[in-house]
Amino acid sequence: MLGELTKKEIEDVLMSNVVGRIGCSSQQKIYVVPVTYAYDGESIIGHTVEGMKIDFLRENPECCFQIDDIKNLFDWVSVIAWGTFEELKGEEAARCSDLLMKRISPIVSAGASQPHRMGPLPTARQATFEKNPIIYRIRIKEKSGRFERR
């Protein structure tokens, strides 16, 4: 059976996952990239370094965020949220960074710290991240969710 998720089910999917995908666009290109995240009940919180994703989001802050939980072809849920990207600074960045670290620390300590199967970050990238992390949020304006169950 195909169906739409309730508001509570959408919130549960957002709260219970730590890996999603940001979809953003710049001029004639669309870019979708997996990221680790935390959900604070209103916004998606993430961190990154300079690169294509940040370039696109700075140019066009309107974006979407997608999360799914797929058990098999006939048992899955998917949530899409649309919102506006914001870079965070100062105390707000520190607060959101703490929230993000608390949410993703279980996967890091469980040895699953590379959810994107990238392997360890190259030394130069890791050094850049530690020195100049970009903390951001996506302020959600709209959410939708679907499921299939048999």
Question: What would you call each of these model-derived segments?
Answer:
Residues 17-49, 65-66:
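Short beta-strand segments
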Residues 48-51, 60-68, 116-123:
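Short acidic (Asp/Glu) patches
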